[in-house]
Amino acid sequence: MEKIIDEKKQGNSLVLEPKAKNTRKLFIESYGCAMNFSDSEIVASILSKEGFNTTQNLEEADLVLVNTCSIREKAEQTVRKRLEKYNAVKRINPGMKVGVLGCMAERLKDKFLEEEKIVDLVVGPDAYKDLPNLINEVEEGRDAINVILSKEETYGDISPVRLQSNGVSAFVSITRGCDNMCTFCVVPFTRGRERSRDPQSIVEEVNDLAAKGYKEITLLGQNVDSYLWYGGGLKKDFKNATEIQKATATNFAALLKLVAEAQPKMRIRFSTSNPQDMTLDVIEAMAAYRNICNYIHLPVQSGSDRILKKMNRLHTREEYFTLIDNIKKMIPNCGISHDLITGFPTETEEDHQDTLSLMEYVKYDFGYMFTYSERPGTTAERKLEDDIPEETKKRRLQEIVDLQQKHSKQNTNSVIGTTVEVLIEKESKKSNKHWSGRNERNTVTVFSKENYQIGDFVKVKIHDCTSATLIGEPIGLSDNN
């Protein structure tokens, strides 16, 4: 499971600057993880060259696309409700075409197209370059489908448009797919095997973003720490590479250094990490470069060795602690967040207490916490009974949330009286007299506007906080501007 985009952004229709020559309208919504939002930018770029401008008005759209997530049942239910809405509009505007992209496309292709007949086209995560052909098929009166998973596709040759961007922060995709086969997760089945993007194309995209005024990028993948470029191909086939390919391969630590050195004033973040794949050289790279942010999203899923084994997580509780110890030793001011699942099949109270004690050991800045949601097609769904009562799941989740809020408040309290560097991203939601941005540790920070602008790096003296937000006063521009 991976970090989910802020709930307030889920389902936002995305829009980019129109091209005068384009005559057709595209309405595109995204749900789920950051990778889906990044993929929607790739789709919009491809379709912009096919005559489509984006619109936020569903009723005027010629083509409606929803980029979908299968991580949790709730996400699929939300998309189904949106498909009902699209089809209600389509009854008024029969010329409108509706398509499903992403993880649900691969999993539910037959149901959507043949049984329920609620969409015109179904396109999997590796087939977006085929969209122009598929749209032509639909316009000629045929259903269209391509959910073939690729061994090579990384979209490294596509320059993504930046949909609804603040002009400050951008995602840069570096890997696709996942090889880890966690028993609860659909990603390996919907996004395929791991493959990495050419580092040169990544650096070129970062340089292009810097030239356009962007101040921060997030290197993105289902498992960024397993990034490995040896000339192309699947990660699992690296063992068959030539000696020269092995000797000249680029791993994630090396990629971090390349990007950090290419743009020394640009903030570098990355997500998501897998504990079993994060190596000391990644932590060393973070410590060595000021512009690599002191923040790691490090999903653990459970604090119980027994449950970790059933999840096919290839690390133990103690190995996770060792990694945490190394991070805190080498990067003392590093923010750490997590994903946790409670109520996994067979989870006992002792297992649950192990999770709480792990949280006490780490004291995360924040986390993404869920009750277990059985996903069709996963190993857990096929081999393990979902045997934990919902009320037990909810009670355990609340205990996890309560403990996380306690730790979050302790962490933000510890920053009071210090000065942090904040990149201004937007106006505060609660006051038009304040800016909102994030510090290096990824903590939201608000402060009075004064004469600063979006995109400025500002030194802020912290005087108050909530469990999720730092509150301070600006004391001047940082030397990173």
UniProtKB/Swiss-Prot annotation:
<dbReference type="InterPro" id="IPR006638">
    <property type="entry name" value="Elp3/MiaA/NifB-like_rSAM"/>
</dbReference>
<feature type="binding site">
    <location>
        <position position="103"/>
    </location>
    <ligand>
        <name>[4Fe-4S] cluster 1</name>
    </ligand>
</feature>
<dbReference type="InterPro" id="IPR013848">
    <property type="entry name" value="Methylthiotransferase_N"/>
</dbReference>
<feature type="binding site">
    <location>
        <position position="178"/>
    </location>
    <ligand>
        <name>[4Fe-4S] cluster 2</name>
    </ligand>
</feature>
<dbReference type="InterPro" id="IPR006463">
    <property type="entry name" value="MiaB_methiolase"/>
</dbReference>
<dbReference type="InterPro" id="IPR007197">
    <property type="entry name" value="rSAM"/>
</dbReference>
<feature type="domain" description="TRAM">
    <location>
        <begin position="413"/>
        <end position="476"/>
    </location>
</feature>
<comment type="function">
    <text>Catalyzes the methylthiolation of N6-(dimethylallyl)adenosine (i(6)A), leading to the formation of 2-methylthio-N6-(dimethylallyl)adenosine (ms(2)i(6)A) at position 37 in tRNAs that read codons beginning with uridine.</text>
</comment>
<dbReference type="InterPro" id="IPR038135">
    <property type="entry name" value="Methylthiotransferase_N_sf"/>
</dbReference>
<keyword id="KW-0949">S-adenosyl-L-methionine</keyword>
<dbReference type="GO" id="GO:0005829">
    <property type="term" value="C:cytosol"/>
</dbReference>
<keyword id="KW-0411">Iron-sulfur</keyword>
<keyword id="KW-0819">tRNA processing</keyword>
<comment type="subunit">
    <text>Monomer.</text>
</comment>
<keyword id="KW-0963">Cytoplasm</keyword>
<feature type="binding site">
    <location>
        <position position="185"/>
    </location>
    <ligand>
        <name>[4Fe-4S] cluster 2</name>
    </ligand>
</feature>
<feature type="binding site">
    <location>
        <position position="33"/>
    </location>
    <ligand>
        <name>[4Fe-4S] cluster 1</name>
    </ligand>
</feature>
<dbReference type="GO" id="GO:0035597">
    <property type="term" value="F:N6-isopentenyladenosine methylthiotransferase activity"/>
</dbReference>
<feature type="domain" description="Radical SAM core">
    <location>
        <begin position="164"/>
        <end position="410"/>
    </location>
</feature>
<dbReference type="Pfam" id="PF01938">
    <property type="entry name" value="TRAM"/>
</dbReference>
<keyword id="KW-0479">Metal-binding</keyword>
<feature type="binding site">
    <location>
        <position position="182"/>
    </location>
    <ligand>
        <name>[4Fe-4S] cluster 2</name>
    </ligand>
</feature>
<comment type="similarity">
    <text>Belongs to the methylthiotransferase family. MiaB subfamily.</text>
</comment>
<keyword id="KW-0004">4Fe-4S</keyword>
<dbReference type="GO" id="GO:0046872">
    <property type="term" value="F:metal ion binding"/>
</dbReference>
<protein>
    <recommendedName>
        <fullName>tRNA-2-methylthio-N(6)-dimethylallyladenosine synthase</fullName>
        <ecNumber>2.8.4.3</ecNumber>
    </recommendedName>
</protein>
<dbReference type="InterPro" id="IPR012340">
    <property type="entry name" value="NA-bd_OB-fold"/>
</dbReference>
<dbReference type="InterPro" id="IPR020612">
    <property type="entry name" value="Methylthiotransferase_CS"/>
</dbReference>
<dbReference type="GO" id="GO:0051539">
    <property type="term" value="F:4 iron, 4 sulfur cluster binding"/>
</dbReference>
<dbReference type="InterPro" id="IPR023404">
    <property type="entry name" value="rSAM_horseshoe"/>
</dbReference>
<dbReference type="InterPro" id="IPR005839">
    <property type="entry name" value="Methylthiotransferase"/>
</dbReference>
<keyword id="KW-0808">Transferase</keyword>
<feature type="domain" description="MTTase N-terminal">
    <location>
        <begin position="24"/>
        <end position="140"/>
    </location>
</feature>
<feature type="binding site">
    <location>
        <position position="69"/>
    </location>
    <ligand>
        <name>[4Fe-4S] cluster 1</name>
    </ligand>
</feature>
<dbReference type="Pfam" id="PF04055">
    <property type="entry name" value="Radical_SAM"/>
</dbReference>
<dbReference type="InterPro" id="IPR002792">
    <property type="entry name" value="TRAM_dom"/>
</dbReference>
<dbReference type="Pfam" id="PF00919">
    <property type="entry name" value="UPF0004"/>
</dbReference>
<keyword id="KW-0408">Iron</keyword>
